[in-house]
């Protein structure tokens, strides 16, 4: 399974996830990994992304006026995006450096499908514009849970 298929599968799991309790301290839970044919990946938890989307009231963090379609559950379809990309190398780095898990509520941004795809497949300039905006909105939450990263470091993770 390639990275794009893996992300689509994860977005599907987010839509199906149940999250009836408010999660806290998700950044303090040690990351877990899956070892597969395509290598080692972080075992991301869909219910954590679901909570981030709910907390954002199903609004795109880049532009709240962006509209999308309704899911079969009657809520706007939104996707969860890890601002600090949730790769195994990043997860290992942040755990070893800060003892923090990047698969946490504070690192997951609610995005409309168009903005989410733009971050992954857009031009470098478009990616930079969105990432800088999201960083400004999210940096205090990241620092609150011990995920300290500069905008330059963050942008380098998207190259």
What are these regions (language model features)?
Residues 1-13:
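Mixed-charge, low-complexity interaction segments
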Residues 3-4, 17, 22, 79, ...:
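Intrinsic disorder/low-complexity signature
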Residues 14-75, 87-104, 149, 155-156:
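Short, charged surface segments at domain edges that flank catalytic/cofactor-binding sites
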Residues 10-17, 138:
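Long, compositionally biased, charged low-complexity segments
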Residues 77-78, 84-159:
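A detector for short metal-coordination/catalytic motifs
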